[in-house]
Amino acid sequence: MDIKLVVGLGNPGKEYEKTRHNVGFMVIDELVKALRAKGPFEEALSHVYKARIGGKEVILAKPMTYMNNSGAAVYNLLEEYKLSPEQMIVVYDDLDLPLGHMRLRLKGSSGGHRGVESIIKYIGTQNFPRLRIGIGRPKKKEDVVKYVLSPFSPEEEKVISQVIKKAVRCLMRAIEISPEHAMEYCNRQDLI
């Protein structure tokens, strides 16, 4: 099934812009630049951008509902554009993947990610592709909430900027061809 919607998860507001939890927004921002997308338009509780890739129209979205209520925006986006969950890829941060790693999956559980839990609750299925971007776990017994809501260190920023570039290439393959085709490329760790 063709991908027609890419949703990056994050929190709106300047104070969250460069935080680990906003890596989904960062990927959308890079994809917007790469595709010279038009927008943002305010639709379906989101900032929406419209682009074409390989002759296909694609919607890029950043929910403005805050992470833990992302499902409301995703539900509205699917309704607004009359899409099935399988026609969407959700991009988000993952504590359980080391920094510098990413994983494209066609379906699965939330893995404890509250934004993804919200999406599953609102749309009633786990059957949608997702691109998980590794942010790693805190080195010390730091509070996880504090960790995900803090910015990357300068060393981490160098790594994450490369991962975001790879994520854009990965998503472009998934849109142009298919998520199944893109999985081998996206899940290789030697390309960043």
Swiss-Prot record:
The record marks D93 as: Stabilizes the basic form of H active site to accept a proton. Its EC number is 3.1.1.29. Keywords: Cytoplasm, Hydrolase, RNA-binding, tRNA-binding. Its main location: cytoplasm. The lineage of its organism: Bacteria, Pseudomonadati, Aquificota, Aquificia, Aquificales. Belongs to the PTH family. Monomer. It comes from the Bacteria. GO terms for cellular component: cytoplasm. This is Peptidyl-tRNA hydrolase. SUPFAM superfamilies: Peptidyl-tRNA hydrolase-like. TRNA binds at Y16, Y66, N68. CDD domains: PTH. It is found in: Cytoplasm. The active site is at H21 (proton acceptor). Hydrolyzes ribosome-free peptidyl-tRNAs (with 1 or more amino acids incorporated), which drop off the ribosome during protein synthesis, or as a result of ribosome stalling. It holds the Pfam family Pept_tRNA_hydro. The keyword RNA-binding applies. The gene is pth.
